[in-house]
């Protein structure tokens, strides 16, 4: 929804109604509560949810004040929308198929940093399913060996001596 003025505080009811109508037509309005068409003060038809807890006056007042109901969106609808797709991140409910790249040498464009080249889609892309919730941040104190950023096995020193020895 676009606004014509930057200092305009709220959206017009027409634009909000067309947005809600678009959501309903797209089939993503996932509330199980029966809906009823009512008229606001301006005579514009809006959708009001009827529940046993709230009277009709409260629901129509909320809509006229600009409160929006919570909308649950389908994952397939997000995949169809171009603005939600990213070359680096894929939203998925499944676990990742492969681990993320460990170092920059896997990227073909990083090998020659001195020349400026245009990016092409033919290069190896790391778009895939990466987990963003499985990492754990804590100090590891019982490691004796590790893998450095170049992939070489190294020994972890328990104590570092500085100065003349």
UniProtKB/Swiss-Prot annotation:
Keywords: Cleavage on pair of basic residues, Glycoprotein, Growth factor, Secreted, Signal. One of its GO terms (cellular component) is extracellular space. Belongs to the NGF-beta family. SUPFAM superfamilies: Cystine-knot cytokines (SSF57501). SMART domains: NGF. It holds the Pfam family NGF. It comes from Anilius scytale (Coral cylinder snake). Residues 1-3 form the signal peptide. InterPro entries: Cystine-knot_cytokine (IPR029034), Nerve_growth_factor-like (IPR020408), Nerve_growth_factor-rel (IPR002072), Neurotrophin-3 (IPR015578), NTF3_N (IPR045815). Residues 4-119 form a propeptide. Glycans are attached at residue 112. Coiled coil: none annotated. Seems to promote the survival of visceral and proprioceptive sensory neurons. Its main location: secreted. It is found in: Secreted. GO terms for molecular function: growth factor activity; nerve growth factor receptor binding. The keyword Secreted applies. This is Neurotrophin-3. GO terms for biological process: cell surface receptor protein tyrosine kinase signaling pathway; modulation of chemical synaptic transmission; negative regulation of neuron apoptotic process; nerve development; nerve growth factor signaling pathway; neuron projection morphogenesis.
């Amino acid at each position: 929804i676009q606004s014509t003025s930057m200092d305009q505080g709220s959206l017009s009811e027409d634009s909000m109604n067309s947005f809600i109508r678009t959501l309903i037509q797209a089939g993503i309005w996932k509330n199980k509560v029966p809906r009823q068409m009512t008229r606001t003060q301006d005579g514009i038809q809006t959708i009001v949810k009827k529940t046993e807890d709230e009277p009709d006056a409260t629901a129509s007042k909320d809509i006229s004040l600009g409160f929006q109901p919570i909308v649950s969106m389908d994952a397939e609808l997000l995949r169809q929308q171009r603005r939600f797709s990213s070359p680096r991140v894929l939203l998925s409910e499944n676990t990742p198929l492969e681990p993320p790249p460990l170092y920059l040498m896997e990227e073909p464009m990083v090998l020659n940093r001195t020349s400026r080249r245009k990016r092409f889609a033919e290069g190896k892309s790391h778009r895939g399913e990466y987990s963003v919730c499985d990492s754990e941040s804590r100090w590891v104190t019982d490691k004796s060996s590790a893998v450095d950023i170049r992939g070489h096995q190294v020994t972890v020193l328990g104590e570092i001596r500085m100065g003349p020895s």
